[in-house]
Amino acid sequence: MKVICYPAKEEWDELVKRPRLDVSELNATVEGVLNDVKNHGDSAVIRYEEKFDHAHLDSLSVSDAEMEEAESLVSLELKHALELAHHNISSFHQSQQFHGEKVETVSGVTCWQKSVAIEKVGLYIPGGTAPLFSTVLMLATPAKIAGCKEIVLCTPPNREGKVNPAILMAAKIAGVSKIFKIGGVQAIGAMAYGTESVPKVYKIFGPGNQYVMAAKQHVSLHDVAIDMPAGPSEVCVIADETSNPVFVAADLLSQAEHGVDSQVFLISTSEEMIEKVKEEVEKQLEQLPRKEMAAKSLDNSKLVLVKDYDEAIELSNTYAPEHLIIATRNYDELAEKVVNAGSVFLGQYACESAGDYASGTNHTLPTHGYALAYNGVNLDSYNRKITFQHLTDEGIRSIGNAVVVMAENEQLEAHANAMRVRVNEVGK
């Protein structure tokens, strides 16, 4: 972990740069798989499942019998945890329901918005180094609340052709419509283009490795919408002399264990706190089953000493972290100054893990500095806003002449005439 003391503001842009992966070599592979799936459907998907996931599949769909078997394999303790998390995620996302009001912008002209769910959405849940069943809840729960008619989930099977039972249990709790045993680029292609088994969807959500991310970006150019661009996961912690170094170290390590390309970023007004956190990280790291992966992630990480709270929050806003933990005495004051972050955790007890699993907020968030322009997944991610307007004859009198003048000055005579004939009719 690299310690940087009092960096000049001219150095900040370089300081907040994330490690960049060269994905140019991925594109040919990704495009080849996507085109094969587009042209050959299920047969291509089954072939790639055997090649990449080493699973020989007779059917891509998860059967009712497999769902029942999965439920019997999940412990009662985990079921209760999933149900609690689902309840909290539901409560928070229910509160985001849109209630559009009709607005009379001028006499005789009424405008309003209507929120309409995206009919078909696709969710990608990685297998990888850990089964992300929590992501099923995060993506499927708001889709169900929004009113999406079809919620399709793809996740890679193991070598025996089985899906992790906790993923299936979470899918059942959250109300997923159809589940398919498909991973990687072929899953993105199947949902983007449709196959004999997999319905074509209108928007794809979910995390994945660099191949999955490249595939999502490729299909988003012409075929389907995606939730957001994404990169490796990250956390930024702002700490002062009152912070608990045990908590801070645990938060940094909880992020570092995601993968070797994850990044942790500590900003502190206290040099002593930085040293305590370093010591505690080394101590806790030895207790982790994924310590080799976490240790490699820490190589990408930075501990930054700043002169005061204002500089701390300014640097954080420049970094635009996916997760921001403010563990200072004045966390509420600093929270008001946050303008760039995916999700913010306030105080000593609000660990990132709470939001990752069960507080109720969504953990599908912009990474890699995308929080400068993107927000995380929320209820609106599954909706479209359609605008309506209604004009009476009084409305024509109110805006008709202005519309004609503006259209004429843009040299769009047909536009002008569409309003002019109505102005003439009302004026009779």
Give the ranges of each region predicted by the language model.
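Conserved small-residue-rich beta-alpha loop and adjacent elements
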Residues: 103-169
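C-terminal core of ALDH-fold dehydrogenases
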Residues: 318-428
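Conserved NAD(P)+-binding/catalytic subdomain of aldehyde/semialdehyde dehydrogenases
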Residues: 175-263
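Short acidic-hydrophobic, aromatic-tinged amphipathic segments that line or gate anion-handling sites
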Residues: 1-7, 178-183, 303-308
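A glycine- and small/hydrophobic-rich beta-loop-beta segment
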Residues: 258, 266-337, 341
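Flexible, glycine/charged-enriched surface loops at secondary-structure junctions
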Residues: 98-103, 225, 262-267, 287-297, ...
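N-terminal Rossmann-like NAD(P)+-binding subdomain of aldehyde/semialdehyde dehydrogenases
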Residues: 1-119
